[in-house]
């Protein structure tokens, strides 16, 4: 019946992320129902951003 520090220890029991069916990465959030890596469950298009890739010599490394 408390909401402070003692209840924070109960968060580590269940799994937050499981393996995604679309991208195969361990990024599918069970509670929210979508993948943090590819966006499965939230959109039909695969989640992709250019800032996620590091640019070396002005050439984007994929």
Curated annotation (Swiss-Prot):
Its cofactor is Zn(2+). One of its GO terms (cellular component) is cytosolic large ribosomal subunit. Transmembrane segments: none annotated. Keywords: Metal-binding, Ribonucleoprotein, Ribosomal protein, RNA-binding, rRNA-binding, Zinc, Zinc-finger. Disulfide bonds: none annotated. The keyword Nuclease does not apply. Signal peptide: none annotated. Zn(2+) binds at residues 20, 23, 35, 38. A zinc finger (C4-type) spans 20-38. Binds 1 zinc ion per subunit. One of its GO terms (biological process) is translation. GO terms for molecular function: rRNA binding; structural constituent of ribosome; zinc ion binding. The keyword RNA-binding applies. Binds to the 23S rRNA. Belongs to the eukaryotic ribosomal protein eL37 family. HAMAP family: Ribosomal_eL37 (MF_00547). This is Large ribosomal subunit protein eL37. It comes from Desulfurococcus amylolyticus (strain DSM 18924 / JCM 16383 / VKM B-2413 / 1221n) (Desulfurococcus kamchatkensis). The gene is rpl37e.
């Amino acid at each position: 019946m408390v909401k402070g520090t003692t209840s924070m220890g109960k968060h580590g029991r269940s799994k937050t992320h499981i393996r995604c069916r679309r991208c195969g990465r361990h990024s599918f959030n069970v509670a929210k129902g979508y993948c943090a890596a590819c966006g499965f469950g939230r959109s039909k298009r695969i989640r992709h951003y250019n800032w996620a890739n590091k640019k070396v010599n002005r050439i984007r490394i994929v």
